[in-house]
């Protein structure tokens, strides 16, 4: 009779345990393995449950269910850890014994009894968590029972975003009724079930910098837990330990051979059981591929399913684009190709297929996949929460192992770049001025009407889509970023409000100050918009290698001509050939006024640049004077 499989594996573990040695030094103590959910194995650096190990601000306590971490005297349960994005999903552990008799009607006992402020710690609340809170509809406290006895709960009901320091609600008005149950239920789920995401920046923390050097030297990272400064310590193994380790490695090799023989014997005895387990696991894996899709899990974690756009299957979009027929390709960029798709109901839509990055190394491929996934999810989260006539609308998405796809409005008349630099018909000055104003209105909406504000980061003539009636829509939000500031600066509109992030964008449009300082603000979009204005004036490309080196960037060329009083040398000659545009070219409120505005937009010091509201006001003033001038020319 064969031995039960559990006895074979128990005996194997017993043999390995006999020959194993117990580490005794501080370094081996810090590197010892132990189980600590939700980490798949031992918590990696910077986390540690041992005093003096890891990072002093990332000390955790392990339990059988979930690890906990204390940040600024608040204890949180760790629901999820992502090594790719350096983020944690936390749920606050509240005092279940606190007195809630006076607030029983509010049913708010499982939420924090004060706002969560991470200022002064390495952590910051992620953009996506702030975005989820900002969509909540506030309640009026005057319609709630016991509001005078529960001032904190009432403050939250007036502004739910207050519970996370730095997040605010996008809804300014208070609802008189019908919101309490929805709001409290959402907050209960937000903290107890889903949690909120926090991030940290390893590049700015000296502990991480020193730890990388320590690990290169085969050291173990820790700190002096007995000193107030908690100085970094790199634990190095002594010579005797290294010799012992080499001996142990030899012994482990022998043990491995014996163990392998023993394990094979057990596997032969329980072969039928192993086959059954394999078939069961394979069937379970195949049935759960779609359920475990990382993009779908990420989106459901950061946004309610009711707020997300519809989901298409890969087969639906493959059929709509005739298997991604090259003849249906209507655009191609750095992040993906765009195809014309026709759904079963006859609706025409644009299907954006993100690139696969074939032919790259394994490491580069994984990096590109992570970046594409982040860009994909980022565009879905932002576009699903905005609504403006001059911004493209997201109709749905598809996350499939075969590809990531986004379904947008199909704009039939190409891009602004097509009209200015190639395939499109000639554009009059009045049309160009209207396009400039519509683009500015879209930028104003992103910067001032959304909380937290959105920086597009890629406003270019290729991302401005033109409809048949010459109305425009700004698209491609893959690089967009939410600006989440602290409570002291959230109501400010100065350029000192910024987030630190790696420069991304299109050459020729990228803000040089952002490129140098890594500080992203709304004024970075203003710079890109200024380059688009220069394209409208000159008809030239933002970057043209056929021009002289000093004039290769359009911004440099136009700025130098304006400073020398030679603007007329770079004005699009097609404007001067059109009789209707003569007044605009010669009048001070026409092309010259827009050129002056573009000059201000690309100012070296971002404090000298106008904001989106100022740009809209100035363009409206210019347009009104231009129309008066056109009418005078028509009368004569």
From Swiss-Prot:
It is a single-pass type I membrane protein. Residues 279-636 are cytoplasmic. It catalyses: L-seryl-[protein] + ATP = O-phospho-L-seryl-[protein] + ADP + H(+); L-threonyl-[protein] + ATP = O-phospho-L-threonyl-[protein] + ADP + H(+). Residues 27-257 are extracellular. The keyword Iron does not apply. It comes from the Eukaryota. The active site is at residue 458. Glycans are attached at residues 73, 102, 146, 224. Pfam families: GUB_WAK_bind, Pkinase. ATP binds at residues 330-338, 352. Keywords: ATP-binding, Cell membrane, Glycoprotein, Kinase, Membrane, Nucleotide-binding, Receptor, Serine/threonine-protein kinase, Signal, Transferase, Transmembrane, Transmembrane helix. Disulfide bonds: none annotated. The keyword Transferase applies. It is an enzyme of class 2 (transferase). Residues 324-628 form the Protein kinase domain. Its main location: membrane. The chain crosses the membrane at residues 258-278. GO terms for molecular function: ATP binding; polysaccharide binding; protein serine kinase activity; protein serine/threonine kinase activity. GO terms for cellular component: plasma membrane. Its EC number is 2.7.11.1. Residues 1-26 form the signal peptide. It is found in: Cell membrane. Belongs to the protein kinase superfamily. Ser/Thr protein kinase family. This is LEAF RUST 10 DISEASE-RESISTANCE LOCUS RECEPTOR-LIKE PROTEIN KINASE-like 1.5.
């Amino acid at each position: 009779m064969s031995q039960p499989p559990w006895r074979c594996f128990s005996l194997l573990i017993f043999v390995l345990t006999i020959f194993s040695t117990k580490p005794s030094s501080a370094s081996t103590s810090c590197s010892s393995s132990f189980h600590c959910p939700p980490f798949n194995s031992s918590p990696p650096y910077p986390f540690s449950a041992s005093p003096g190990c890891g990072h002093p601000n990332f000390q955790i306590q392990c339990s059988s269910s979930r690890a906990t971490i204390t940040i600024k005297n608040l204890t949180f349960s760790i629901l999820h850890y992502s090594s790719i994005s350096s983020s944690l999903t936390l749920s606050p552990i509240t005092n279940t014994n606190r007195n809630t008799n006076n607030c029983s009607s509010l049913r708010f006992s499982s939420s924090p009894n004060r706002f969560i402020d991470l200022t002064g710690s390495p952590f910051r609340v992620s953009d996506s968590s702030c975005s989820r809170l900002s969509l909540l509809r506030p309640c009026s406290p005057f319609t709630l029972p016991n509001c005078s006895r529960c001032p904190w709960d009432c403050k939250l009901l007036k502004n739910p975003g207050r519970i996370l320091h730095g997040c605010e609600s996008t809804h300014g008005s208070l609802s008189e009724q019908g919101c309490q149950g929805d709001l409290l239920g959402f907050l209960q789920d937000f903290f107890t079930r889903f949690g909120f995401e926090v991030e940290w920046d390893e590049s700015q923390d000296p502990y991480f910098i020193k730890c990388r050097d320590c690990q290169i030297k085969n050291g173990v990272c820790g700190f002096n837990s007995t000193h107030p400064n908690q100085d970094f310590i790199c634990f190095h193994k002594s010579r005797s330990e290294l010799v012992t380790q080499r001996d142990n490695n030899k012994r482990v090799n022998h043990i491995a051979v014996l163990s392998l023989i023993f394990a094979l014997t057990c596997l032969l005895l329980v072969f039928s059981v192993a086959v059954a387990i394999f078939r069961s696991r394979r069937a379970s894996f195949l049935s759960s591929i779609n359920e475990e899709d990382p993009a779908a899990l990420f989106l459901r974690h950061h946004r309610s399913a009711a707020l997300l756009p519809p989901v298409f299957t890969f087969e639906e979009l493959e059929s709509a684009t005739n298997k991604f027929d090259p003849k249906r390709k209507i655009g191609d960029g750095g992040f993906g190709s765009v195809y014309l798709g026709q759904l079963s109901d006859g609706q025409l839509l644009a299907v954006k297929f993100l690139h696969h990055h074939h032919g790259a190394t394994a490491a580069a491929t994984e990096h590109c996949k992570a970046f594409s996934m982040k860009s994909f999810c980022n565009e879905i989260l932002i576009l699903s929460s905005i609504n403006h006539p001059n911004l493209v609308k997201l109709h749905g998405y598809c996350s499939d192992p075969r590809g990531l796809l986004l379904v947008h409005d199909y704009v039939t008349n190409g891009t602004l770049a097509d009209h200015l630099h190639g395939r499109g018909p000639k554009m009059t000055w009045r049309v160009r001025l209207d396009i400039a104003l519509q683009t500015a209105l879209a930028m104003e909406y992103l910067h001032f009407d959304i909380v937290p504000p959105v920086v597009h980061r890629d406003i270019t003539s290729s991302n401005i889509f033109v409809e048949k009636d010459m109305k425009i829509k700004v698209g491609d939000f893959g690089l967009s970023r939410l600006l989440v500031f602290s409570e002291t600066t959230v109501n400010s509109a100065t350029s000192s409000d910024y987030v630190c992030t790696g420069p991304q964008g299109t050459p020729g449009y990228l803000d040089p100050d952002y490129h140098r300082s890594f500080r992203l603000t709304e004024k970075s979009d203003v710079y890109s918009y200024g380059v688009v204005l220069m394209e409208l004036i000159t008809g030239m490309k933002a970057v043209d290698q056929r021009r002289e080196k000093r004039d290769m960037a359009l911004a440099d060329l136009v700025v130098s001509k304006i400073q020398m009083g030679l603007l007329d040398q770079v004005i699009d000659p097609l404007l001067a050939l059109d009789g209707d545009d003569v007044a605009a070219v010669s009048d001070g409120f026409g092309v010259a006024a827009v050129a002056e505005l573009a000059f201000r937009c690309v100012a070296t010091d971002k404090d000298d640049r106008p904001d989106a509201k100022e740009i809209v006001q100035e363009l409206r003033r210019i347009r009104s004077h231009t129309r008066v001038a056109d009418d005078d020319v028509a009368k004569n």
